[in-house]
Amino acid sequence: MPSMDIVSEVNEVELRNAVDNSVRELKSRFDFRGKEASIEYKDHVVTLSAEDDFQCQQLVDILRMQMSKRNVDPKSMDVDDKAVHSGKTFSLRVKFKEGIETLIAKKLVKLIKDSKLKVQSSIQGDSVRVTGKKRDDLQAVMALAREADLGQPFQFNNFRD
């Protein structure tokens, strides 16, 4: 009986590469010449700091663009609402969503059940296990999960036949 797990993970290596590319772009951008701005990555948190709130938002856009280039879904970003002002710099903290929260998992299971596909889905910690009789049903669930706008990207692993 085919089964798979629906998870939400961020590829650590690709994320680090995206941050490094963002730092490189920051150093070469003309509008940041002579300005004090930085992008730092530590313990699954990216800290963006700049002299102005507008520049912090530009740094977020740079990071999003580089993440897209490295195939890391920007939906996994959880950006602070307001930049923290300390001294002469503004800083934003960007955290990344790991695992599927219980509320989102319940919505996903309900979405799968409402689709009338012949599959069973169950919440297992921070992932959702889906089993069905046919591989085509699981592929339909994959398409359904990708289309669903639940504010979080999903990956599929442990696909067994």
Swiss-Prot record:
GO cellular component annotations of the record:
cytosol
InterPro entries linked: DUF520 (IPR007551), UPF0234-like_C (IPR035571), UPF0234_N (IPR035570), YajQ-like_sf (IPR036183)
Work out whether the entry's keyword set contains Lyase.
Answer: no
Gene3D superfamilies xrefs: 3.30.70.860, YajQ-like, domain 2
CDD domains on file: YajQ_like
Keyword vocabulary terms for this entry: Nucleotide-binding
UniProt-recorded Gene Ontology molecular function terms = nucleotide binding
PANTHER family cross-referenced by the UniProt entry = UPF0234 PROTEIN YAJQ
What is the purpose of this protein? Answer: Nucleotide-binding protein.
Similarity comment: family membership: Belongs to the YajQ family.
Can you say what this protein is called? Nucleotide-binding protein swp_1151
Q: Which organism is it from?
A: Shewanella piezotolerans (strain WP3 / JCM 13877)
High-level lineage:
Bacteria, Pseudomonadati, Pseudomonadota, Gammaproteobacteria, Alteromonadales
